Amino acid sequence: MRGGGNMQQMMKQMQKMQKKMAEEQEKLKDEKVEGSAGGGMVKVVVTGHKEVVDVVIDEEAVDPDDVEMLQDLVLAATNEAMNKADELTSERLGKHTKGLNIPGM
């Protein structure tokens, strides 16, 4: 049974890594990132779990004759916030998977 100890050690390391990643995932739900558009006239805040928790629209961004512009600004700010949430997740979880070749991490 050569190598059995190595396999057990590897399994322990994997369990430890899974625990740390689960802890990081839990922390991410409380982390917030902000995306903005229109020079900050529209701001969207999301958690690390990509839950939108706040939308702030400056009065200057509201033009009843150009609703489409406001929609575009909200969309752009939301996409930016979601991308920042992805980056935060990759950064936080990536430190636990360094050196491993795991697709999508």
From Swiss-Prot:
Disulfide bonds: none annotated. One of its GO terms (cellular component) is bacterial nucleoid. Residues 1-36 are annotated as: Disordered. Residues 7-16 have a biased composition (Low complexity). It is found in: Cytoplasm, Nucleoid. SUPFAM superfamilies: YbaB-like. It comes from the Bacteria. GO terms for molecular function: DNA binding. The keyword Cytoplasm applies. Keywords: Cytoplasm, DNA-binding. Residues 20-34 have a biased composition (Basic and acidic residues). HAMAP family: DNA_YbaB_EbfC (MF_00274). Binds to DNA and alters its conformation. May be involved in regulation of gene expression, nucleoid organization and DNA protection. Homodimer. Belongs to the YbaB/EbfC family. This is Nucleoid-associated protein Sca_0120.
